[in-house]
Amino acid sequence: MSQSVSERTRIKSDRYESGVIPYAKMGYWDAAYAVKNTDVLALFRITPQPGVDPVEAAAAVAGESSTATWTVVWTDLLTACDRYRAKAYRVDPVPNTTDQYFAFIAYECDLFEEGSLANLTASIIGNVFGFKAVSALRLEDMRIPHSYLKTFQGPATGVIVERERLNKYGIPLLGATVKPKLGLSGKNYGRVVYEGLKGGLDFLKDDENINSQPFMRWRERFLYCMEGINRASAATGETKGSYLNITAGTMEEVYKRAEYAKTVGSIVVMIDLVMGYTAIQSAAIWARDNDLILHLHRAGNSTYARQKNHGINFRVICKWMRMCGVDHIHAGTVVGKLEGDPLMIKGFYDTLLLTHLNVNLPYGIFFEMTWASLRKCMPVASGGIHCGQMHQLVHYLGDDVVLQFGGGTIGHPDGIQAGATANRVALEAMILARNEGADYFNSDIGPQILRNAAKTCGPLQTALDLWKDISFNYTSTDTSDFSVTPTANV
């Protein structure tokens, strides 16, 4: 039933009465709100301060991440404030907790600048995480509408085009991070690259903190790496590469290093997450314009992504980075040395690889979302993995992944080339067994497949003997709220 003019006037008068009034009363809570296809949706895990009503806490987050301040301001009347206010429209208790709530908030798409992740995040996470009304706050998931997604370029190259360039289909890609990550000379660094690629890897990789230090300047590293790449490619007949880290202190220097990498023939460059969102988007645009693959190391992410009740779920970072336009991003291993619950990792991989996401609460996916025409982003599995885990890696991570064996290649007793060969033989044996219908994930059958392959591959046998007892059985801190799944790597 329509309201009378006098009733609408009274409501408006109450809303704009000078002073401090609850956020929910100011219009930031609307349980009857009908979500629009064009809305940006965010799901926050809210832990209200003792005595704070969860609905008011949700409304406060909605207000402070959109148009509100701590008191009523008359200049709201000069805007379409009823439209621009974010609306918290649903609050649910988090399963198996007593003080945490999932708050669903809708934002008008016009609140955000087109194609600017910096502007989107300035609102969504810019101010609310220090808000006194909540003792902890975590951004768990987002739905980005089709209309807003289309203002971002997405991955510069994408999974399909990368596979076409490498001529590798139906199998994970193999890589390794040069170790030690710091201290090598340029010549020795290039030798590591050559040995790894000659032994069967597709990629070598700079680590996140190798840029241009006194022991090895960036230009020296690029030249020796390309020498190793070219020699290995000529010897094997395969397209090879090494992720040349172009991260630097200024964008001018980033572009300088990127241009040099292109000039000397690299097919891929690398940046770190700590560069910042604007720098990442800029590098992605450059990579697409210059036809290079762009690898992103998620350096720094666990400072805000690991804790379950505060920060940003890495799933959201995956969405943001796919929008920004990176081609690769480290997304977890399940079985390695770094944080990784199986269901959470699967949710990250689906976010990067699927063209359409359906709601999947055990995977932590709360919203249905289409990726418009943005390309797929290749997940990278890195950190404490070795060839003895190959059956688990293939099972958990699938084909579209780069398996990065750093220590698991360079730590091989017979040398780097032997370590690379061990990984390649193990992978190809496991993929062959899978394609033939073997129950390769079985704890007896999977290891036996590797042992059989090792009968004709000495480096693989040596690796299996060396690392057979190595595992990282720790309970993950970030686990599904809707399913109990202990991390399994045995």
Swiss-Prot record:
Enumerate the residues binding substrate: N127, T177, K181, R298, H330, S382
Residues at the site labelled Transition state stabilizer: K337
The record's annotation in InterPro entries points to: RuBisCO, RuBisCo_large_chain_AS, RuBisCO_lsu_C, RuBisCO_lsu_C_sf, RuBisCO_lsu_fd_N, RuBisCO_lsu_N_sf, RuBisCO_lsuI
CDD domains named among the record's database cross-references: RuBisCO_large_I
Q: Is the keyword Oxidoreductase assigned to this protein?
A: yes
Cofactor annotation? Mg(2+)
One biological process GO term for this chain? reductive pentose-phosphate cycle
N6-carboxylysine: modified positions: K205
Localization, UniProt = Plastid, Chloroplast
Q: Which residues form the active site?
A: K179, H297
Gene3D superfamilies, sorted:
Ribulose bisphosphate carboxylase, large subunit, C-terminal domain (3.20.20.110), RuBisCO large subunit, N-terminal domain (3.30.70.150)
An annotated GO cellular component of this protein is: chloroplast
Q: Which domain of life is it from?
A: Eukaryota
- Its main localization is plastid
Question: Which family does the similarity line name?
Answer: Belongs to the RuBisCO large chain family. Type I subfamily.
Spell out the NCBIfam families in the cross-references: PRK04208.1
Assembly with partners or alone: Heterohexadecamer of 8 large chains and 8 small chains.
Q: What else is known?
A: The basic functional RuBisCO is composed of a large chain homodimer in a 'head-to-tail' conformation. In form I RuBisCO this homodimer is arranged in a barrel-like tetramer with the small subunits forming a tetrameric 'cap' on each end of the 'barrel'.
Stated name of the protein: Ribulose bisphosphate carboxylase large chain
Q: What is the lineage of its organism?
A: Eukaryota, Sar, Stramenopiles, Ochrophyta, Bacillariophyta
